[in-house]
Amino acid sequence: MAVSQEPDTPIALSVGEGELIGTSVVKAARPEVSLIELEIKPGGSVQPHLHKGHSDSFYVLEGEVEFYVGDEVVQGSPGTYVLAPPGVVHFFKNVSDEPARALNLHTPGGFVEYRRELETLHAAGEKPDTAFFERHDIFDV
């Protein structure tokens, strides 16, 4: 079954199925929820940031991922769930020598468009500016 943006359409995807964006696989791209399967390379990380208008959560599938959420540091292994509510600074890093995989859930949705636009910029050899990130509710700190 394909990824649907329609709120009343069911989604049922197997491992690896979905819309491929870079090394990420989009499982759901809806106004109410975005679900993305991330592959995080060894040492891979994101900058500390926050979202003003949505929650950002992670469920570790494989590997070891260190999460920083507010004042907490969580050593994530398979089965670990982490939630960063709106306004809470968060970031993560793969702290192992092996790739990690995690499900990344954004509520409400709309975050997949950010991933698509970012991949297009990278493919063109361009870097996003601050306005790009703010338009997608990402505020670096």
Identify the residue ranges that each predicted region occupies.
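Short acidic-glycine-tyrosine-enriched beta hairpin
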Residues: 6, 71-89
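A short, N-terminal "cap"/entry segment at the start of jelly-roll beta-barrel domains
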Residues: 1-34, 120-141
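Conserved short histidine dyad/triad with adjacent acidic residue
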Residues: 36-51
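Glycine- and acidic-residue-biased ligand/ion/polar-headgroup-sensing regions
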Residues: 53-65, 70
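Short histidine-centered beta-strand/loop micro-motifs
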Residues: 26-28, 47-52, 93-95
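A short hydrophobic beta-strand segment most commonly corresponding to one strand
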Residues: 83, 91, 97-113
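A generic "binding-loop/recognition-motif" signal
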Residues: 42, 53-54, 72, 88-89, ...
